[in-house]
From Swiss-Prot:
GO cellular component: plasma membrane
Alphabetical keyword list: Cell membrane, Disulfide bond, G-protein coupled receptor, Glycoprotein, Membrane, Phosphoprotein, Receptor, Transducer, Transmembrane, Transmembrane helix
Pfam families: 7tm_1
Gene that this sequence comes from: Gpr182
Glycosylation-annotated residues: 24, 33
Disulfide-linked positions: 122-198
Membrane topology of this protein: Multi-pass membrane protein
Name the UniProt record assigns to this protein: G-protein coupled receptor 182
Residue ranges crossing the lipid bilayer per the database entry: 54-75, 87-109, 124-145, 167-189, 214-235, 255-276, 296-316
Length: 395
């Protein structure tokens, strides 16, 4: 998962002849171990491995359940409202892909980073993880942009072509996410020996340049640019909703800020650590104690970044009353009849009180629609306009 090679002592490894042809092995070992020769700090590696395993396991179990539920519920949705959830559905698929790769990292940690699954899986697993990582980030970015466009754009052209545009954007995101990791993956190799390791190993003569290029591209494309777009469009959306003075505008504005903060918390520590370790020794010189500390906590920080697979389903799905109602309706279908009647009554009661946002003409306030109006209220029920609404795109 990392472009930073492990600095652990690897002197027991004996590379084969093919590997010696592209690397100066003595200098490469010195590169891996140079941070340990100047000042060595004793860390409890066993404790770190236990913490990593428990952390990976918790993210795997919770993330698997959450994203499977999100996919099941959103796959059953159709029509205009369902199209607004297209980014959420694809983001859940990408997050699920990351979750499914976690058992491999868990075993690698317990085996002290010994790779036992061959050369092909060494590259494929990393590629699979990176494709889904970029896809998840890009779909989150597209969702933030689409939410604002949906709120502000009432042109007939957008109304006619929005579904086609969203499908094209989703396809483009998957293609782009499949291309971006290639420069990194082609240099991921299995280091054969008594304890095989799967590492990023560009030719030694150009190693620093390759590592810096990969790290910078990951930082710019995987964090800086998406974070800028997510922050700008969520702030614009929050300001727009606040001006409409609707009942739940405060809640929606808080959600906009939560989207920004959670993204930064998940990815900023990882990106900063990776960039510092990549730049160290060639462009900047950090204190050796700090370098040892960063290397020790790098895997923990990397694991921490995967919390977005747990946070995304909560922020973009489970906080939505409509999603919870549809989830309960889906569960009711598989319950025995007696329990289904009781649960169905609760679902009906819940759905009758939830509200959805209907975007009206420019300058007017959003109307509230009650799902099950009484007969006396039917004549006052607002007409559904052709402009898109933000139900569950915001909630």
């Amino acid at each position: 998962m990392s472009v930073i090679p492990s600095p652990r002592p690897v002197s027991t490894l004996e590379p084969d002849n093919d590997f010696r042809d592209i690397h100066n092995w003595t200098e490469l070992l010195h590169l891996f171990n140079q941070t340990f020769t100047d000042c060595h700090i004793e860390f409890n590696e066993n404790t770190k491995h236990v913490v990593l395993f428990v952390f990976y396991l918790a993210i795997f179990v919770v993330g698997l359940v959450e994203n499977v539920l999100v996919i099941c519920v959103n796959c059953r949705r159709s029509g205009r409202v369902g199209m607004l959830n297209l980014y959420i559905l694809n983001m859940a698929i990408a997050d699920l892909g990351i979750i499914l790769s976690l058992p491999v990292w868990m075993l690698e940690v317990m085996l002290e980073y010994t790779w036992l699954w061959g050369s092909f899986s060494c590259r494929f697993i990393h590629y699979f993880y990176l494709v889904n990582m970029y896809s998840s980030i890009f779909f989150l970015t597209c969702l933030s942009i689409d939410r604002y466009v949906t709120l502000t754009n009432t042109s007939p052209s957008w109304q006619r072509h929005q579904h086609r545009i969203r499908r094209a954007v989703c396809a483009g995101v998957w293609v782009l996410s499949a291309i971006i990791p290639l420069p990194e993956v082609v240099h991921i190799q299995l280091l054969d020996g008594s304890e095989p390791m799967c590492l990023f190993l560009a030719p030694f003569e150009t190693y620093s340049a390759w590592a810096l290029a990969v790290a910078l591209s990951a930082t710019i494309l995987g964090f800086l640019l998406p974070f800028l777009l997510i922050a700008v469009f969520n702030i614009l959306t929050a300001c727009r909703l606040r001006r409409q003075r609707q009942t739940e505008s405060r809640r929606h504005c808080l959600l906009m800020w939560a989207y920004i903060v959670v993204f930064a918390i998940c990815w900023l520590p990882y990106q900063v650590t990776m960039l510092l370790l990549t730049l160290h020794g060639t462009h900047i010189f950090l204190h050796c104690h700090l370098v040892n500390l960063l290397y020790f906590f790098y895997e923990i920080i990397d694991c921490f970044s995967m919390l977005h697979c747990v946070a995304n389903p909560i922020l973009y799905n489970f906080l939505s009353p409509s999603f919870r109602g549809r989830l309960l309706s889906l569960v009711v279908r598989y319950l025995p009849k007696e329990q289904a009647r009781a649960a169905g009554g609760r679902a009906s009661s819940s759905s009758s009180t939830q509200h959805s946002i209907i975007i009206t003409k420019e300058g007017s306030l959003p109307l509230q629609r009650i799902s099950t109006p009484t007969p006396s209220e039917t004549f006052r029920r607002p007409l559904r306009l052709q402009t898109p609404h933000l139900h569950s795109a915001i909630l």
